[in-house]
Amino acid sequence: MAVGTTPGELRELTDDELKDKLRESKEELFNLRFQMATGQLSNNRRLRTVRQEIARVYTVLRERELGLASGPAGEES
């Protein structure tokens, strides 16, 4: 099974939790890129999965901004 967070799991998080997840993912991507540049990265696939996770978080945040989806448990953001 894929490592990471599914869109359904992300939609259950609050906006603040999503922003924290986004920050953590961006930090991880930075570290992975640094490891790649120094030749220490053993799992190149992780770069792609982290980028996809960042895109998923941005998508959920944008859906809420446009009113296409509500926050967790039907709360409006």
UniProtKB/Swiss-Prot annotation:
Question: Which GO terms label this protein's molecular function in UniProt?
Answer: structural constituent of ribosome
Disulfide bonds, paired cysteine numbers: none
What's one Pfam family here?
Answer: Ribosomal_L29
Listed under GO cellular component are:
cytosolic large ribosomal subunit
Task: Decide whether keyword Ribonucleoprotein is in the record.
Answer: yes
Keyword tRNA processing appears in the UniProt entry: no
Instruction: Note the PROSITE patterns from the entry.
Output: RIBOSOMAL_L29
- Record keywords, A-Z: Ribonucleoprotein, Ribosomal protein
The biological processes this protein is annotated with in GO are: translation
The parts of the chain that form a coiled coil are: none
Please give the start and end residues of each transmembrane region: none
Query: InterPro entries given for it?
Result: Ribosomal_protein_uL29 (IPR050063), Ribosomal_uL29 (IPR001854), Ribosomal_uL29_CS (IPR018254), Ribosomal_uL29_sf (IPR036049)
Which family, according to UniProt? Belongs to the universal ribosomal protein uL29 family.
Protein name (Swiss-Prot/TrEMBL): Large ribosomal subunit protein uL29
Species name? Mycolicibacterium smegmatis (strain ATCC 700084 / mc(2)155) (Mycobacterium smegmatis)
Give me the gene this protein comes from. rpmC
